[in-house]
């Protein structure tokens, strides 16, 4: 019997949760339940466009689904409320039937003017290429190790994990590599330490007041393509998140108005404690003044928390260039590509398809929604 693609009915949420648990496990399902109300219903952007969740159904059995939530995107002088897809998954017993592609096509049809994809796997990338998406850029991820010995030992264990006589010998050298790595990284971090200059002061965990609306208005004039970062969106994204605890650093000038901010959180990866710079935002014209002040603050914070490694991703080119002075390593492997489906005849296409026009960060994806 043919599979029907349609919007989820309320009584089918349990079946959707069962598929999620099959793919990611019961613990991840608990996180997904906790963020469902927040991400899909209390999101401020739902005031102008509702979240949507499509299911693939055969004989009343849900076999797969794709969800999407709205987000406000500014492109040049135009603000769009776009649908952002997430959680595309198919039940393991219904794969190789083209269901994933049909679900994405349903999303594209509803998305209208612009469809979005952050493709986290080669299979997803191939699917979106086939559907006509254009690669905008692969978000660069950059790193700063803090506890060199732990980082080097952990990475060495992964590199030498495969069983072979040579790897067994190399594994014995892991403590030596860790000690050497500690010294090299300590020296590099000393050389690449941020120094606060100017008269900016940093406030930790400020209230997102009207000053952040003013910052958004001023900074967004200099950034052609960016998702909304006004006070209400910041409150929802970083204060009301039911899963992740975020810490905010705001740089203020003598008038008290924010000149920029950084948002960070903590996670674990490969037995390492990872500090993530979720966003670092300021007018690009003030990046040289603001980034160093904020970086000095969140580096001290991460050191006090015993973080092993710091990561950041994307950002506007001017902001990224300043941050790269202090986060000097690039992550190995392929980056997560950002892809968009927008007619080349659309007057906004040139801006959307130009990587140097964007400010995109960890916070614009959903990586921290499930720790």
Give the location of each predicted region.
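Non-catalytic N-terminal targeting/anchoring module and adjacent flexible stem/linker
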Residues: 1-11, 346-347, 370-371
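A conserved beta-strand-loop-helix scaffold within acyl/acetyltransferase catalytic domains
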Residues: 3-89, 202-282
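Hydrophobic, well-ordered secondary-structure scaffolds
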Residues: 83-88, 102-111, 120-127, 145-146
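Conserved acetyl-CoA-binding loop-helix of GNAT-fold acetyltransferases
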Residues: 90, 95-109, 287-300
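Secondary-structure boundary elements
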Residues: 109-114, 252, 256
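Active-site/acyl-donor-binding loops of N-acyltransferases
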Residues: 114-189, 207-208, 237-240, 247, ...
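Charge-rich interaction segments
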Residues: 169-222, 232
């Amino acid at each position: 019997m043919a599979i029907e693609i349609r919007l989820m009915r309320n009584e089918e949420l349990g079946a959707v949760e069962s598929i999620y648990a099959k793919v990611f496990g019961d613990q991840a399902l608990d996180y997904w339940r906790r963020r469902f109300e927040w991400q899909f219903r209390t999101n401020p952007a739902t005031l102008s466009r509702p979240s949507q969740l499509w299911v693939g159904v055969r004989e009343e059995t849900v076999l797969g689904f794709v969800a999407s939530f709205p987000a406000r995107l500014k492109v040049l002088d135009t603000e769009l409320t776009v649908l952002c897809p997430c959680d595309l998954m198919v039940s393991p017993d219904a794969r190789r039937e083209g269901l994933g592609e049909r679900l994405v096509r349903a999303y594209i049809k509803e998305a209208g003017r612009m469809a979005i994809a952050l493709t986290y796997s080669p299979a997803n990338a191939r699917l979106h290429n086939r559907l006509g998406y254009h690669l905008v850029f692969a978000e660069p991820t950059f790193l700063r190790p803090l506890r060199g010995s732990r980082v080097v030992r952990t990475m060495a264990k992964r590199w030498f994990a495969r069983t072979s006589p040579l790897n067994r010998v190399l594994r014995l050298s892991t403590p030596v590599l860790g000690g050497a790595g500690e010294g090299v990284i300590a020296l590099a971090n000393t050389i690449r330490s941020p120094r606060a200059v100017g008269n900016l002061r940093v406030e930790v965990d400020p209230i997102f007041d009207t000053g952040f609306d003013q910052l958004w208005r001023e900074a967004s004039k200099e950034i052609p393509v960016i998702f909304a970062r006004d006070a209400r969106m910041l409150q929802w994204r970083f204060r009301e998140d039911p899963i992740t605890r975020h810490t905010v650093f705001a740089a203020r000038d003598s008038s008290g108005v924010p000149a920029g901010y950084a948002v960070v959180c903590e996670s674990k990866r490969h037995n390492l404690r990872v500090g993530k710079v979720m966003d670092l935002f300021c007018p690009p014209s003030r990046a040289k003044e603001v980034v160093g002040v904020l970086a000095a603050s969140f580096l001290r914070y991460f050191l006090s928390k015993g973080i092993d490694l710091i990561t950041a991703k994307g950002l506007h080119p001017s902001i990224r260039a300043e941050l790269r002075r202090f986060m000097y390593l690039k992550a190995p492997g392929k980056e997560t590509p950002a892809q968009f489906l927008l007619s080349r005849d659309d007057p906004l296409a040139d801006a959307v398809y130009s990587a140097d026009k964007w400010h995109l960060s960890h916070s614009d994806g959903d990586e921290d929604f499930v720790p």
